[in-house]
Amino acid sequence: MTDKTILRALKGEVLPTPPVWLMRQAGRYLPEYRATRAQAGDFLSLCYTPDLAAEVTLQPIRRYGFDAAILFADILLLPQALGLDLWFETGEGPRMSTVTSMEGVKGLKGKDDIHDKLAPVYETCKILSRELPKETTFIGFAGMPWTVATYMIAGRGSKDQAAAHKFKDTDRAAFSALIDAVTVATIEYLSKQVEAGCEVVKLFDSWAGSLKGQDFEDFAVEPARVITAEMKRRFPGLPVIAFPREAGQGYIGFAEKTGADCVAIDNSVSPDWAAENVQKGKTCVQGNLDPSYMVTGGQELVEATKKVVAAFKNGPHIFNLGHGITPEANPDNVTLLMETIRKG
């Protein structure tokens, strides 16, 4: 029996106190993160400098004692390794060169040619597997093919993923080839993370909610199923957390369809609904406090936290936010969150 509570929850154990970690727990809300990022010079340099990436991963563990650390990286490192240019515009977010044709898909690097660029990420994993406290679970991650493809097609983030939908609907063959290429590369990327020490992998599909009907099945469910099945074939017993953000009704049965051990849910659905329809006493659920409470704090944070814990108490549960913690969050509110959960 492991003493790592997150691994126990992922195996379906119902724990008296849910284990906790937060998406983007290593981030700009922490002064120590801002100092380390300044030392790195820019965001991508931080991702590609193993000592500094490991340091920012460890900072929230030291400060709060979270039950898991998640590798500090970015979902767009993979398309960069596939050969696209990636840069960050101040105040604007990521920008990339684009893939908008079958010719562009064929021009991507092969799955075995991505590792030189990603070698610093694997080195970060090795450092963390040595330095993390023995009770802390180490989570690796990647973006899911649909979400990664939306950036590769548009060259930037967008609210409606219009460019990706247009490509999908006008050149299905090229779009499907792109999804397949990203799927294959994602498996190789995650495999190297696990070989370097990650104990769990999380699949982030941040824009899954924009896929409807059969498209959701084809481009959110199916890639998650393929990736999960192959990762479990290569690494028997490896737990997988899937996060099809804003899937709504699509959360129902997602674990069963994909083989994921846990479904992470956002805060657009209520904890009670998710407990009844997704968790059902047996499926591990991760989530789903509204990140805005990390900004506002106070008694409202305490009550909302207790509500999430109470909703999921009869099944396996990992406490997290419904989305990443924001730069405006107050570090003291995270302390209050942890005290509220741990006191029960």
Curated annotation (Swiss-Prot):
<dbReference type="GO" id="GO:0019353">
    <property type="term" value="P:protoporphyrinogen IX biosynthetic process from glutamate"/>
</dbReference>
<dbReference type="InterPro" id="IPR038071">
    <property type="entry name" value="UROD/MetE-like_sf"/>
</dbReference>
<comment type="subunit">
    <text>Homodimer.</text>
</comment>
<feature type="binding site">
    <location>
        <position position="323"/>
    </location>
    <ligand>
        <name>substrate</name>
    </ligand>
</feature>
<feature type="binding site">
    <location>
        <position position="43"/>
    </location>
    <ligand>
        <name>substrate</name>
    </ligand>
</feature>
<keyword id="KW-0627">Porphyrin biosynthesis</keyword>
<keyword id="KW-0210">Decarboxylase</keyword>
<feature type="site" description="Transition state stabilizer">
    <location>
        <position position="74"/>
    </location>
</feature>
<comment type="pathway">
    <text>Porphyrin-containing compound metabolism; protoporphyrin-IX biosynthesis; coproporphyrinogen-III from 5-aminolevulinate: step 4/4.</text>
</comment>
<dbReference type="InterPro" id="IPR006361">
    <property type="entry name" value="Uroporphyrinogen_deCO2ase_HemE"/>
</dbReference>
<feature type="binding site">
    <location>
        <position position="74"/>
    </location>
    <ligand>
        <name>substrate</name>
    </ligand>
</feature>
<feature type="binding site">
    <location>
        <begin position="24"/>
        <end position="28"/>
    </location>
    <ligand>
        <name>substrate</name>
    </ligand>
</feature>
<dbReference type="GO" id="GO:0005829">
    <property type="term" value="C:cytosol"/>
</dbReference>
<feature type="binding site">
    <location>
        <position position="151"/>
    </location>
    <ligand>
        <name>substrate</name>
    </ligand>
</feature>
<protein>
    <recommendedName>
        <fullName>Uroporphyrinogen decarboxylase</fullName>
        <ecNumber>4.1.1.37</ecNumber>
    </recommendedName>
</protein>
<dbReference type="GO" id="GO:0004853">
    <property type="term" value="F:uroporphyrinogen decarboxylase activity"/>
</dbReference>
<dbReference type="InterPro" id="IPR000257">
    <property type="entry name" value="Uroporphyrinogen_deCOase"/>
</dbReference>
<feature type="binding site">
    <location>
        <position position="206"/>
    </location>
    <ligand>
        <name>substrate</name>
    </ligand>
</feature>
<comment type="similarity">
    <text>Belongs to the uroporphyrinogen decarboxylase family.</text>
</comment>
<keyword id="KW-0456">Lyase</keyword>
<keyword id="KW-0963">Cytoplasm</keyword>
<dbReference type="Pfam" id="PF01208">
    <property type="entry name" value="URO-D"/>
</dbReference>
<comment type="function">
    <text>Catalyzes the decarboxylation of four acetate groups of uroporphyrinogen-III to yield coproporphyrinogen-III.</text>
</comment>
